[in-house]
Amino acid sequence: MSAKKIVLKSSDGESFEVEEAVALESQTIAHMVEDDCVDNGVPLPNVTSKILAKVIEYCKRHVEAAASKAEAVEGAATSDDDLKAWDADFMKIDQATLFELILAANYLNIKNLLDLTCQTVADMIKGKTPEEIRTTFNIKNDFTPEEEEEVRRENQWAFE
């Protein structure tokens, strides 16, 4: 017997047929399955097909890793390392895609993907000056020098 399939529909009208186990990585979709609301497909108005394909790729890999870990307990450390390496490679994406993935992971309530994407942004910020952060994320400085100084004084602990 084949695994049950669920159809996910992106905001731009593309449909993706995925195994239920993969779709259940999303708590949002899991609740819809519990409520028996997936027979005609799951519309995801906040997720484009490009991002949904990435989300599905991530969920598939993590479901496969969990299944292989359950089968072979001895090699578990190796599979964890492999998954971490895969995650690191998966995060080698442009900023726009990264930010869209964060929004999708949040909307779909996929905690591990949200943690991974947010950690990636945190790593991009770590150890940088405010000016370097602005450059990295293309943020315009709209503070006056006085306002900037006031923020530095109020948050002195963060600059130590």
Curated annotation (Swiss-Prot):
One of its GO terms (biological process) is ubiquitin-dependent protein catabolic process. InterPro entries: SKP1 (IPR016897), SKP1-like (IPR001232), SKP1-like_dim_sf (IPR036296), SKP1/BTB/POZ_sf (IPR011333), Skp1_comp_dimer (IPR016072), Skp1_comp_POZ (IPR016073). It is found in: Nucleus; Cytoplasm, Cytoskeleton, Spindle; Cytoplasm, Cytoskeleton, Phragmoplast. SMART domains: Skp1 (SM00512). Residues 102-160 are annotated as: Interaction with the F-box domain of F-box proteins. Involved in ubiquitination and subsequent proteasomal degradation of target proteins. Together with CUL1, RBX1 and a F-box protein, it forms a SCF E3 ubiquitin ligase complex. The functional specificity of this complex depends on the type of F-box protein. In the SCF complex, it serves as an adapter that links the F-box protein to CUL1. SCF(UFO) is required for vegetative and floral organ development as well as for male gametogenesis. SCF(TIR1) is involved in auxin signaling pathway. SCF(COI1) regulates responses to jasmonates. Part of a SCF E3 ubiquitin ligase complex composed of SKP1, CUL1, RBX1 (RBX1A or RBX1B) and F-box proteins. This is SKP1-like protein 1A. The gene is SKP1A.
